[in-house]
Every structure is written in C-alpha cells, then in structure tokens.
Curated annotation (Swiss-Prot):
This is L-lactate dehydrogenase. Belongs to the LDH/MDH superfamily. LDH family. Its EC number is 1.1.1.27. The gene is ldh. GO terms for molecular function: L-lactate dehydrogenase activity. The modification Phosphotyrosine is found at residue 228.
C-alpha cells in the first residue's frame, strides 16, 4: 500500500452544505477517493439525508465511503472541511452581492465547525469566497494557512481549457494562471503564460501569431464571466467546482506539495494586506505554506492592487 493510500483510508473530508455545489463536491471526492470518508452536513434534514443515501447506494463502486446528516457532529474530526453553505448566486448577481447575507451565516457557522474539528483545514467555496475567507479567519482566530478558499483555481482551469481550445493542443501543455478576486476583477498573468515553455504571445502557427492582444482580452473575459452564462442556463455551477474541490483535497491530504491558485489573507503582497485574493500558493498537509513570488509586470501589479481595493470596499461594507 502506498503512503497516499494509507493516508486516504484514514482521512476525512466534510462538506458543509448539501446544495448543488456541496453535493457535487461530495460526489467528486467520493468517486475520486480523495479521502477515506466523505461527510455531508446541512441543516435541511430531509435534503441532506436524501443526498447521503443517494451517494451511499453507489459506494460499492467507489474507493471511499460516505456519511452525513443534519447534526454538526457529523463533521467531527475532519481533516479538511469545505464550506459551500449560503445563499445561491442568482442570474444577474455578482458574487460580491452575496457578501452580507453569507457573512452572517459564516460568523455563526465557523465556531461550530472549529469546535468539532479543531485541527482541520477550512476551505471556503461559498461566494464571495475572498471576502468570506477574511470573515472566517476573523470568526475563528485561526492562522491564514488553515483558512482559505478555492479562489481562482476553477477560473484558471477555465482559462487553460479556453487556451487549449484556441491553440488546439493538449491541456497539460498549457501553463496560465488567473489571480486576484474570484470575480469580475480577476485577471490572467499573461506575462508568464506559456504553452510548453513558449510565451503565449509568441505562439504561432504557420508564422502567424495565434494569441493577439484582442484574442487574449476575449479569453480573459470569457474565463471571468463563464459562471454567469452557466447560471443563466441551468441555475448554478456545480460539476467543475466539485472537481476543483476534490483536487484541492488531494493536495491537502497527500504527501508532497502542489502549487495551486488559492485565495488566502495577504500580508504585504505588493503592499496588499488584510484582504484575501488568489495567487499561486504552495499547498501541503499544513495548508498554505506560502505564496509563490511569481513575476508580474507593472500592469499586472496595478490590476492586483485594484482587485484588492475592490475587496477592501466590500469588507468595509459588511464590517
């Protein structure tokens, strides 16, 4: 048995919130075997019990088991706790529009979760995840390495998929990252983006540049606003964020380190402090070990500061 297999069998992930996002996250963790035990918790008793039963009926075919219910004790002794509970983003709403109501939910919820799992890592998925990461840290007093959010991890995956489609290459060759707010002010780090080591602005086919400035602008916009289109069409985004959370859980539970774009509370990052926003982070069993000092050009640093200012304003409005 490998070290990861042994760790996985002994580990527990809890997902708080049995809505479309939480249930999809629990399902993704279950079928991938992200941990040995997946627990789903929600105060809506009938809903969560139905979701748990539906998941449990298929565990003959999964490498993990599932439990859960409407008692917060179902989350006890978790290694990683994902928070997906909160008001759902409606068509036309920005993520920041949800800040006030979801912040109040979180201030009540977080102390209960920490009491059940005092040594856990806590991952915010509920939007606006950057703002709520600050709220969650303040509500618990936990260090920033243990309270963070999925941030732009999904946005980065969206961007890489779009680049892959445009360049007609395998996605594993695409290296590009979105940073800043998980929301309208996010932006790609085009200055370091590349395809198999070739700067993205230099990628050419038959001598013609594939990624002109107009193309890059369109791709950035499409990645940032993809969720709005999905919400308009089906009411929620759930499958991709479920897979995102499962992948993050594995990075937090397995030996070794990963580099992922996550949102954590910044301390003097390009002069930014007191807000959570996404940067490439070193991730391990200890949570976020540090922020990667990725190279950024002058325009990108200005965009990061503008994104931080936007988040500062929202935090001030719900203080």
């Amino acid at each position: 048995m490998s070290t990861f297999d042994a760790t996985r069998r002994a580990s527990k992930i809890s997902v708080v919130g049995a809505g479309s996002v939480g249930s999809s996250l629990a399902y993704a963790c279950l079928i991938r075997g992200s941990a040995g035990l997946v627990s789903l918790y929600d105060i809506a008793k009938d809903k969560v019990e139905a979701e748990v039963a539906d998941l449990a009926h298929g565990t003959q075919f999964t490498p993990a088991s599932v439990m859960g219910g409407a008692d917060v004790h179902d989350t006890a002794d978790s290694d990683v706790v994902f928070i997906t509970a909160g008001a759902r983003q409606k068509p036309g709403q920005t993520r920041l529009d949800l800040a006030g109501v979801n912040a109040n939910i979180l201030r009540s919820l977080m102390p209960q979760l920490v009491e059940q799992s005092p040594n856990a890592l806590f991952v915010l998925v509920t939007n606006p995840c950057d703002v709520l990461t600050v709220v969650a840290q303040e509500a618990t007093g936990l260090p920033a390495n243990r309270v963070f959010s999925t941030g732009t991890m999904l946005d980065t995956s969206r961007l890489r998929w779009l680049i892959r489609q445009w360049a007609n290459v395998e996605q594993r060759h695409v290296h590009a990252t979105i940073v800043g707010e998980h929301g309208d002010s996010e932006f790609p780090l085009w200055s370091t983006a590349n395809i198999s080591g070739v700067p993205i602005r230099d990628w050419a086919v038959d001598g013609n540049r594939v990624f002109t400035e107009d193309v890059l602008a369109d791709l950035a916009h499409e990645a940032a606003y993809a969720a709005y289109k999905i919400i308009e069409g089906k009411g929620a985004t759930n499958y991709a964020i479920g897979l995102t959370g499962a992948r993050l859980a594995e990075a937090l539970l397995r030996p070794g380190r990963s580099v992922l774009p996550l949102s954590s509370v910044m301390t003097d990052m390009h002069g930014i402090s007191g807000v959570a926003l996404s940067m490439p982070c070193i991730v391990s069993r200890d949570g976020i070990e540090g922020v990667v000092p990725v190279a950024m050009d002058t325009e990108e640093i200005a965009s990061l500061k503008a994104s931080a200012e936007r988040l500062h304003d929202t935090l001030s409005s719900i203080a």
